[in-house]
């Protein structure tokens, strides 16, 4: 039986992952990259290019290079979103006979699912090269706020690419699954997902082994693309002021501006200022024109502030729908490349009143979650004989691949217990019941006993149908599981018997594994926190060096730069919490010496000829920064 892969089909980039030996792996593409640009191009020779190679030639071939196709998935041509996209995108968008938005390249019309399928095929091929076997099944993620037509379009893209789409799952749910937060108890979490083209906020409640999505909201037309557009518009307006030329009429110039805007935006996540240099951007009667501008982080934040603020309204709605306040959220998870923007992180932190969790790569986490879900769906059925008491908990897989216990371990038999579940999607007419035994929080980590399906559920909005799942262990230790639709009375059941059950040693091993994983989760969190602390310290000290560098002796500057590099190296390479903390402490001491030197110099200048009010203010600034560093 072949492997099923997990795919994050993104607006800007796409990622493919697979679970190998119980661990999710992000699969590199043919160019060795872990993310693949969601770009498709057609050359004048009739060649089709996908990914990085397509993105590289976009400047010289803008009309035949398709990007951000996800924004057109499942949309009507006359929709406001498509009409807005037409103004911005260099390729031709046309109306299909059914009213959908299609693209036209060299006289040939393509549907968005067709273009998306080309991206999926590249990812499928990368997975086959990696695994050395054909891949025919996948779980593909979509924004939680995607409507039915957008979801169907995504599923169609999979079929076109030769993939049997086992499931379409929501990106925030996949992210929560990959982060492993489902292993914690009694937690309310918010997943803030700002990607290249879409924004989602999901409020999830985790407790007693169940992931329950309490509310979701979002904007399927808000993302990093819009940030790029703001920078592009600023560049165009500034250039127009300088040269009197409107670059909007030049498609090749627009493509260069788009790439430069995206690059500048990314650089400003770590730098305070960046230079945008586009020689020969255009020409007029007087000769060629060059674009050379500086963009500061502060200016970028000013340009995109309303976009970031726009994401807060869905957050408020989702919290309201969930019946929760910001203070009741225990953990905030950032997903999507655009959440690397410091201003986004600050706004989210201010809104929820707590620092967001940054433990996993926001570009890859959704694909990893999809791969885990794919592995869960491909679980092998194994029969087992149960003993007089049930030594391990029995339950089923629920939303997000979580193990929901129905009968706890050490329950005396015979026993019979029931629980009511519901559907996870609108108009769902069937549910698959997967029966597991074990103590781990994720179903895939436990032992799969059997699978059966309840069909014929009348179509209804998700959350409306009531499915009663009953576990019945008789005196012979035989487990019967049934699922009944309470509205129609339709029922399906499975009887699990086996010639050999779990041995005592296997039971002990499962318990040990569960405990070991709990410890491992704690250790990973400690490492993430230590690295965050190191990042903060490095940023603070580097800022002090930039601001006060001319007042520090050369020897002292050299010592502190060495301490910064050492701290950064250890942070990036070490998995030892104590080693990272020691490096942070060493850097803190080095920065403290700088503070003392600055303080002494400030004191000496005060004793000189009458210090001015301005110098006193500077002293105050220095002291405040020293205090802030020490507090950290």
Curated annotation (Swiss-Prot):
Domain of life: Bacteria
PROSITE patterns on file: HSP70_1 (PS00297), HSP70_2 (PS00329)
Gene3D superfamilies per UniProt: 1.20.1270.10, 3.30.420.40, Actin, Chain A, domain 4 (3.90.640.10), Substrate Binding Domain Of DNAk, Chain A, domain 1 (2.60.34.10)
Record keywords, A-Z: ATP-binding, Chaperone, Nucleotide-binding, Phosphoprotein, Stress response
Bias (Acidic residues) ranges: 620-632
Molecular function terms from GO: ATP binding; ATP hydrolysis activity; ATP-dependent protein folding chaperone; heat shock protein binding; protein folding chaperone; unfolded protein binding
Compositionally biased residues, Polar residues: 604-614
Pfam families cross-referenced by the UniProt entry: HSP70
SUPFAM superfamilies membership: Actin-like ATPase domain, Heat shock protein 70kD (HSP70), C-terminal subdomain, Heat shock protein 70kD (HSP70), peptide-binding domain
UniProt modified residues of type Phosphothreonine: 198
GO BP terms in the entry: chaperone cofactor-dependent protein refolding; protein refolding
Family per similarity comment: Belongs to the heat shock protein 70 family.
Task of the protein: Acts as a chaperone.
NCBIfam families with a match to the protein in the record: PRK00290.1 (NF001413), PRK05183.1 (NF003520), prok_dnaK (TIGR02350)
Entry protein name: Chaperone protein DnaK
Organism encoding this protein: Thermodesulfovibrio yellowstonii (strain ATCC 51303 / DSM 11347 / YP87)
């Amino acid at each position: 039986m072949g492997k099923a892969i997990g795919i994050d089909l993104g607006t800007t980039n796409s990622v493919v992952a697979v679970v190998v030996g119980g661990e999710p792996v992000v699969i590199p593409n043919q160019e060795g990259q872990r993310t693949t640009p969601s770009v498709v191009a057609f050359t004048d020779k009739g060649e089709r290019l996908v990914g990085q190679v397509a993105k590289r030639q976009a400047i010289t071939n803008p009309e035949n290079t398709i990007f951000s196709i996800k924004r057109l998935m499942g949309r009507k041509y006359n929709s406001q979103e498509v009409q807005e996209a037409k103004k911005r995108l260099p390729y031709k968008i046309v109306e299909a006979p059914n009213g959908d938005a299609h693209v036209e390249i060299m006289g040939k019309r393509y549907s968005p699912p067709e273009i998306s399928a080309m991206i999926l095929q590249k990812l499928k091929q990368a997975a086959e090269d990696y695994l050395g076997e054909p891949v025919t099944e996948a779980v593909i993620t979509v924004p939680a706020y995607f409507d039915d037509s957008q979801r169907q379009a995504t599923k169609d893209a999979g079929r076109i690419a030769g993939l049997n789409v086992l499931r379409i799952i929501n990106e925030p749910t996949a992210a929560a699954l990959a982060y492993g937060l489902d292993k914690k108890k009694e937690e309310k979490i918010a997943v803030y997902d700002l990607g290249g083209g879409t924004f989602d906020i999901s409020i999830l409640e985790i407790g007693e082994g169940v992931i329950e999505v309490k509310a979701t909201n979002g904007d399927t037309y808000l993302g990093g693309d819009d940030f790029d557009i703001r920078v592009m518009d600023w560049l165009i307006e500034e250039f127009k002021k300088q040269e009197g030329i409107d670059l909007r009429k030049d498609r090749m110039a627009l493509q260069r501006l788009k790439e430069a805007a995206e690059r500048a935006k990314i650089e400003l996540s770590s730098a305070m200022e960046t230079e945008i240099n586009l020689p020969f951007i255009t020409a007029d009667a007087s000769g060629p024109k060059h674009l050379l501008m500086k963009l500061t982080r502060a200016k970028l934040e000013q340009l995109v502030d309303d976009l970031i603020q726009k994401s807060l309204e869905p957050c408020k709605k989702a919290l309201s729908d969930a019946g929760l306040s910001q203070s009741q959220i225990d953990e905030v998870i950032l997903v999507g490349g655009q959440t690397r923007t410091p201003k986004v992180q600050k706004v989210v932190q201010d809104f929820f009143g707590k620092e967001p969790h940054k433990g996993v790569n926001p570009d890859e986490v959704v694909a990893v979650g999809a791969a885990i879900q794919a592995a869960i769906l491909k679980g092998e059925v194994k029969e087992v004989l149960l003993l007089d008491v049930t030594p391990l908990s029995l339950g089923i897989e629920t939303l997000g691949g979580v193990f929901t216990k129905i009968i706890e371990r050490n329950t005396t038999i015979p026993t019979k217990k029931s629980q009511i579940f519901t559907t996870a999607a609108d108009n769902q007419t069937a549910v698959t019941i997967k029966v597991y035994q074990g103590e781990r929080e994720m179903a895939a980590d436990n032992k799969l006993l059997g699978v059966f399906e309840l069909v014929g559920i009348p179509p209804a909005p998700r959350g409306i149908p009531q499915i009663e799942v009953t576990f019945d262990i008789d005196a012979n230790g035989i487990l019967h599981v049934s699922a009944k639709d309470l509205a129609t009375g339709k029922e399906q059941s499975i009887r699990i018997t086996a010639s050999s059950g779990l041995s005592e040693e296997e039971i002990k091993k499962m318990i040990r594994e569960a405990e070991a994983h709990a410890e491992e989760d704690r250790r990973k969190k400690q490492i993430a926190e230590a690295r965050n602390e190191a990042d903060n310290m490095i940023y603070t000290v580097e800022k002090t060096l930039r601001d006060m560098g001319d007042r520090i002796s050369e020897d002292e500057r050299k010592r502190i730069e060495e301490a910064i590099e050492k701290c950064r190296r250890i942070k990036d390479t070490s998995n030892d919490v104590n080693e990272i903390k020691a490096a942070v402490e060493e850097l803190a001491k080095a920065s403290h010496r700088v503070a003392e030197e600055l303080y002494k110099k400030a004191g000496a200048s005060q004793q000189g000829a009458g210090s001015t009010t301005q110098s006193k203010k500077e002293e105050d600034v220095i002291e405040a920064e020293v205090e802030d560093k020490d507090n950290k």
